[in-house]
From Swiss-Prot:
Residues 77-88, 108-147 have a biased composition (Acidic residues). WD repeats lie at residues 226-265, 269-310, 316-356, 364-404, 420-459, 467-507, 511-550. Belongs to the WD repeat DCAF8 family. The keyword Flavoprotein does not apply. Residues 1-91, 108-163, 594-631 are annotated as: Disordered. Coiled coil: none annotated. Pfam families: WD40 (PF00400). This is DDB1- and CUL4-associated factor 8-like protein 2. Keywords: Repeat, WD repeat. Residues 44-54 have a biased composition (Polar residues). The keyword Hydrolase does not apply. GO terms for cellular component: Cul4-RING E3 ubiquitin ligase complex; cytoplasm. It comes from Homo sapiens (Human).
Amino acid sequence: MSHQEGSTDGLPDLGTESLFSSPEEQSGAVAATEASSDIDIATSELSVTVTGDGSDSRDGGFPNDASTENRSSDQESASEDIELESLEDFEHFLMSGESLFHYPLVGEEETEREEEDEEIQEEGGEEEEEEEEEEEEEEEEEEEEEEQPRAGPQGSGGNHEQYSLEEDQALEEWVSSETSALPRPRWQVVTALHQRQLGSRPRFVYEACGARAFVQRFRLQYRLADHVGCVNTVHFNQRGTRLASSGDDLKVIVWDWVRQRPVLNFESGHTNNVFQAKFLPNCGDSTLAMCARDGQVRVAELINASYFNNTKCVAQHRGPAHKLALEPDSPYKFLTSGEDAVVFTIDLRQDRPASKVVVTRENDKKVGLYTITVNPANTYQFAVGGQDQFVRIYDQRKIDKKENNGVLKKFTPHHLVNCDFPTNITCVVYSHDGTELLASYNDDDIYLFNSSHSDGAQYSKRFKGHRNNTTVKGVNFYGPRSEFVVSGSDCGHIFFWEKSSCQIIQFLKGSREGTINCLEPHPYLPVLACSGLDHDVKIWTPTAKAATELTGLKKVIKKNKWERDEDSLHHGSLFDQYMLWFLLRHVTQRGRHQDWRSGEAEFPDEESDESSSTSETSEEEVQDRVQCMPS
């Protein structure tokens, strides 16, 4: 959700479900109990049940019967399991030749009972021994499996066991610290409702949309399914009435997301995966900008967001172009970045729209870019991130290539300045007022920087628990004042952190395929759209009756942390193997091209330089494929 409070033209009214029964506000508050009737009446006004024409949600709105169907299906499956077990028992008796119905003679009854008791005791003892042995074997196997991937002292005996125990204890302590009790919410439901009734809360809805109570009640409302491949991008128009999506099928779909139907479906004109498609602001939804893996930047001309005219290429990168950055109020200008390290500014009013702003370099070496964002408070400034650890801020008015490669200032976590393994930044985004800058690092955490701090300043906050490894994963602020941080994860979950406390307050299963890449908040409503490896767009709204329980959170973040640590340990060996292969290949090529007449074993200087530059490019490409493969 951006900071803008756009027009509500064409949008449905909000009304019917309760959104404010958070456990934090129910902590023994007697006053809240006495005023429960008032709260029920007020909260009914603040629900987020969205329908196309104000009708019942069952007539094309949000589905509300899923939980009942799930419960009934679970009961049916449970009854089927019970019947299956009874049939198996019956077959067991038939195969063993025993009789289900045995009637002893009168004189034999007591004797048989004693014999049966003895047999049962013997069989019971044997079964208990067998079960104990099986349990011990299973425990030993589990311990072996857990110990195998761990890196540590390889000695036998107590040293290895002590190391494993210390490692497990440290991991448990880390998980506990990340899932500790949440602080008291700043926005109080009872107080806010009371002030609203008195007329002293004119921005009630605006403030409520940034409240923790809404975020903790998010649940999946429906899926928008019309793509035949991964969906890489979703974007709301300025008024929030339309949603654009695109992906691997090269199609762009414009949705009426409230009525759950596409209003426009057209070919993008790209030849490879579309990475981003965005409506330009203040143009009546008539212009859509796109970029893709083929390096092209294209613009589609729409008429009232319901009729497609054509697309044209306005810029060409020499590598994949992952992100666009819009100027908040301009219907003509935007920025693009690509893996060729180039930043273009596009002005649709010019005959030649694209002009090169800067080529990102570090120590005279190009740095491929994955992300770009414009400062909403100062549109001359923009930030980029890519194939190294630095977030760079530029000012278009004073880019001097001779001074610090034109960089105004750059940030990175201090522990990553001289790290032993390559680090990538997959997404950078400014807060609603441009004072903060959020950066998501590949195989690391999410860091918050103060954009007004001096060059090289340390991060101010750090958000942990998710995993960012396999794709170019996005991150975003959520809330009218950027109160929350939201990100997808390789584990298929969506994580919400409260920015002030850096703690996880919401944890949602967002993908069947395992990765969520793009998260787009609505401009002013408490609605979130997301996409990833699944072939659909998911719409989330805060319509759950109670706050979502963070069931399984500790297990998931523990697994994410363990997998990340394992990858960091193995990365060095993989890189060394690649370098060994490259050196052997280089030596072989030199042997083949030796001058047999003179016996010289050295290349000319020009060929050596060219080979060196080629090796740098190859090394970068391999590292990119290993660490940060775009979807």
